[in-house]
Amino acid sequence: MAKLLEITGKAISGEWGQDDDTGTGIPVLRTTNFTNEGFVNYKNVVTRSISKKNIAEKYLRHGDVIIEKSGGSDKQPVGRVIFFEGEENKYLFNNFTGLLRVQNPEEWLPKYVFYALYAYYRNGGTRAFENRTTGLHNLQVDNYVKSVDIPKLSCRKQQHICETLDHVRAAVAYREQQLTKLDELVKARFVEMFGDPISNTKRWDVIELGSLTGIGSSKRIFEKEYVSEGIPFYRTKEIVELSKGNPISTELYITEKRFLEIKEQYGVPQKGDLLISAVGTIGVIWIVDEKNDFYFKDGNLIRVDSSDRFNSTYMKTLLESLIAEYKKQMSSGTAYSALTISGLMKMKIYDVPLSLQNQFADFVAKVDKSKLFVGSAAAHKPFDIGFFSQKHCATPCKRGIISSKHMIFH
């Protein structure tokens, strides 16, 4: 084992400088340019006027690892890392990030060190080094560098791990491209059958959504009514997870007794209803299934009742486009963005034959089957260390990636 400090030395601090008024400044990478897959996103790279001397060593080189020092959230811890493979001696990095540069590449392959640190991050290791001030999450970089252990393997074994992970990462990226294309296929099929959802190119009659079905929220549940187990209580977070087909991490519950009271007096979501996020991440839609009883938070979510006058899959696809347009118009006129019940009720819906809606839903069901097949591979991220270490890792890490508090591979 070797401490990260022995491999890279202390993290090098970034630069920010002044506004670039002349357009001749230095490109500076920020946490905005971090991706959760460990790549650098070169969109929206800012240029800054930096006049400090002795910054030559701070220009990024191939194989540098950039670490996030400040940022993150309760859901996403600080400490992400990205691997730099771009043009050398062109980019700097800002003061919310740090540079970890392998001092002896002949002994430690930079990409191996990167993969090890990424594995550590994905397994929550950086949470132990977080400070929180005014909502920001800051990484105790010095303690991090002093504490993290990385196994000392031969260069041949390091290379094998890197090559294997590179192949897995490339395969996952390809699968994710396929998923994106399948989503685009659904949108293209919708336009082919019904025309543009905003401009109504096929001249359908339109009616207000509120005239088709009931639209509302939920009975208010007070904080004192939350319990540690019982009937799941969904907020925007859970609906976003469900809409993506991901397992949910329910944190709030109400008692079954309270649920049954609400069910009898006011009703609860039924199969085919649409739940739509109304604040924060606006416009995420989930079609309710019958897998589990649940209730949901008023204000956060809007419920569109299912109806024999429309197909829920068709309506979900149409509303996604209409709400996206609604958000554009809303963002230019208000400081606080939210989807309202009244706004949803007034949305103009195509009055198309139900038979056509059902045809579209059948097409979507076939695409969803393809997405399940493709997604089963894409879901296994190359940095999903439990998956990698148990099924694909070579002998050096076959016993698991993290085996002690600050160990990466084992």
Describe the role of every protein-language-model region.
Residues 2, 16, 90-98, 126-156, ...:
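A short glycine-rich beta-alpha junction/loop motif
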Residues 33-46, 90-91, 241-255:
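Short, basic/aromatic beta-hairpin or loop at an interaction surface
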Residues 1-37, 52-56, 69-74, 202-245, ...:
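Low-complexity, Lys/Gly-biased intrinsically disordered segments
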Residues 1-15, 149-163, 171-219, 228, ...:
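Non-catalytic DNA-recognition/assembly elements of restriction-modification systems
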Residues 31, 141, 187, 206, ...:
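ATP/adenylate-binding site constellation spanning eukaryotic-like Ser/Thr protein kinases
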Residues 30, 56-118, 235, 259-260, ...:
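A short beta-sheet element
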Residues 122-125, 326-327:
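Periplasmic-binding protein-like
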